[in-house]
Structure formats: C-alpha cells, structure tokens
C-alpha cells in the first residue's frame, strides 16, 4: 500500500484534502466535541481562517510523523467532509471587481450564503440556485484579509445559524446581505448539517498574472 492509500485508510480522507492553498475553497465539517478541543478562543469566529490554518498545519505534522493525535473533520455518509474546490468567479462578479478598480463602484465582498442546489458551477450564474437561511457577514461573523497577493475569507455556519437537519450543496460570496452581486459560487457534495455540528468555509483567491 502506498503512502497516500495508507493515509486515507488511517484518517478517513485523502492526503490532498489537508492542504489549504491559493485559489481553493476548503469546506470542512466538525462535531462540537472535536471543535472544542482546538477552537477554544472567545473570538474564534473572527479568527476562523487562522484557526483552520493552524489546525490543518498540525494535521500535516501528524502525517509527517505518522501520528493520529490531531482532531480531524468528521465524515458524512460516503462523502469526505473536507474537500478542495476550485474557485468559480462568475461573470457578474468579475465585472464588479473591475469596476472597483476603476472607481465605478464601492462594493466589497463581505457576505456568504449557502444553499441546497447542487447544480454544477457556471460563469453565467448570478447567485445561489436554492438559498437556505440568511447570509453571514465576513467583517462581523467571520474573517477576511489579504496576505501578499491572496485574498482570504472564512466563515462558520452551525445549528444556531440554520434550521437543521439540512443538506447543503452550494455556497456564494456576495456584496450585500440581500440581492447584491455574486462574486464566486461553488457546488460541493452533500454536507448534512445536524445538531451539534458546524461547517467551515475557507476561501483563498490568489491575484496573479496569467
């Protein structure tokens, strides 16, 4: 058995899913018990990116050292609860970004919404296929920042934010709490959020030359 196969057998998800890297959405689901062992700060929500990066860095060290001491995401059905998805920048979001550069608009990407429609991503989309619950604001309930040339956004949804159980399959970032401009949208395999669970979105958008 090769190393990657051994890792998946030991931890329950692929080795590549431990990486937080540029231009990826990272979706992870945690139980209250595992979450409470490492997310102990009173201000976790406003440091959610830092918390996730630290946690998966420690998980990577476990990998290197052949240990299983670090808390990991839980699994749902046969789907991995931690998966990397390429960002999808929709056309309306790209146009809005260009207008910010030229001063034609003053919007910012400050909201994220989730939904139940698993339709594949397309640049022509303008929002969620089937929105569920209220959007949450990065600058209030999450974290957003720029590190070098990478814009980072982080948000946590738990059973106090959404009526559970619910199967989530999509997420969008927006410029407003309602309506507004969608910047990116992803679809992902079923994440069944239930009582005592939380889902974390870590979004990395690298600005670079083509």
Feature annotation, model-predicted:
Residues 1-169, 176-210:
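Small cysteine-rich, disulfide-bonded extracellular modules of the LU/uPAR three-finger superfamily
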């Amino acid at each position: 058995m090769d190393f990657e196969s051994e890792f998946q057998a030991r931890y329950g998800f692929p080795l590549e899913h431990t990486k937080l890297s540029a231009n990826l959405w990272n979706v992870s689901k945690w139980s209250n018990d595992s979450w409470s062992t490492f997310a102990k700060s009173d201000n976790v929500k406003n440091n959610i990116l830092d918390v996730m990066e630290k946690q998966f860095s420690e998980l990577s060290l476990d990998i290197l050292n052949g240990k299983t001491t670090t808390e990991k995401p839980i699994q749902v059905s046969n789907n991995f609860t931690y998966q990397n998805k390429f960002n999808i920048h929709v056309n309306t979001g790209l146009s809005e970004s260009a207008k910010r550069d030229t001063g034609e608009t003053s919007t910012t990407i400050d909201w994220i919404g989730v939904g139940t429609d698993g339709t594949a991503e397309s640049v022509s989309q303008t929002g969620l296929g089937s929105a569920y619950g209220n959007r949450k604001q990065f600058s209030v309930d999450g974290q957003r920042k720029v590190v070098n040339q990478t814009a980072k956004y982080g948000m946590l949804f738990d059973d106090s934010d959404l009526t559970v159980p619910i199967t989530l399959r999509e997420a969008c970032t927006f410029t407003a709490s309602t309506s507004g401009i969608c910047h990116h949208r992803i679809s992902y395999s079923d994440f069944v959020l239930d009582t005592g669970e939380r889902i974390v979105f870590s979004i990395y958008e690298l600005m670079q030359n083509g």
